Amino acid sequence: LLDIQLKKDFIDTAQSPYYITEEEEIRSLIKPRKRFAHKGAFGHALLIAGSYGMAGASILSARACLRSGVGLLTVHVPIHNHDLLQTTVPEAIVQTDIHDHYFAEPVDTDRYQAIAIGPGLGQEEDTALAMMEQIQGCPVPLVLDADAINIFGTHRNWLSRMPKRCILTPHL
């Protein structure tokens, strides 16, 4: 590796429309909950995840979503992953896709306040097309992770159609 010889204050002075969210910023957004508050008061998220052989990604991301504080979580998975997810994350609402092994049909998103898509999703062409249909015109905050980002890597001409309220979580 070679040092590219940037001055130490370059990052602080460089203009960019992008930024990295730090832990302190997130902690300041978390509000304390009342002891007997209803779960419905803390939002309903949709997680579209998993494909055949990748059920673990949907399980881990569902647990992480619940730990983040969402009140209700619906996880949309291929039919083949239903029983495994329902057994390992019983507090999640499990919804199945029309396909046995991968995401192939967009989901109605009217009742959700946030959507995440990508963990273990796979990159089948049907999945890529369904994902693009799903995210276009998405009216709520959207998190793209893992295979959702990889799909944009193989369909670079779709980048211009990425929604504005979109958070990317790449593996660096």
Language-model regions, residue ranges each:
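Small-residue (G/A/S/T)-rich helix-start motifs and N-terminal tracts that mark the onset
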Residues: 1-146, 150-172
